[in-house]
Amino acid sequence: MTIQSPTIEAPTAVQPKLRFTPEEYFAHEERAEYKSEYHNGEILPMTGGSINHNRIARNGLTLLTVQLQDSSCEPFGSDMRIWIADHQLCTYPDLAVICGEPLFYANRNDTITNPVLIVEVLSPSTEDYDRGRKFQAYRTLPSLQDYLLIQQEAPLVEHF
């Protein structure tokens, strides 16, 4: 019987994060079965919302649609992306409103650059991001006039 000593492998280097161009991100989104956000070269999968989250977003879209029907403004739900050039960030807010003609990123009719209102329904897993890094990026949009954060666990709406 021969006893062999264990093989010890040299440690491997930490794999660098994959970096993608915006064009690669959009190509990924077109064939993906889930939504992702683009963060300065990284593609980050999004989590789904709770039933309350979806109810609040749906009710908000319905309310905005009725209130804005005779205006030059148009509300959009969470399938409309927003591109924030200064941060190389592409997000899917819960609701957005455009007034006047939409301005599209790279002639893509699914990605706007000129929202006047952005609404996020807060979730425990995303609240810090919605209040922090994402809000910081949204503030660089020249068109943005209002940002609303809606709590789903309590009747609270914050307006910035």
Question: Residue ranges of each PLM-predicted region?
Answer:
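Gly/Pro/Ser/Thr-rich low-complexity, intrinsically disordered segments predominantly at protein N-termini
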Residues: 1-160
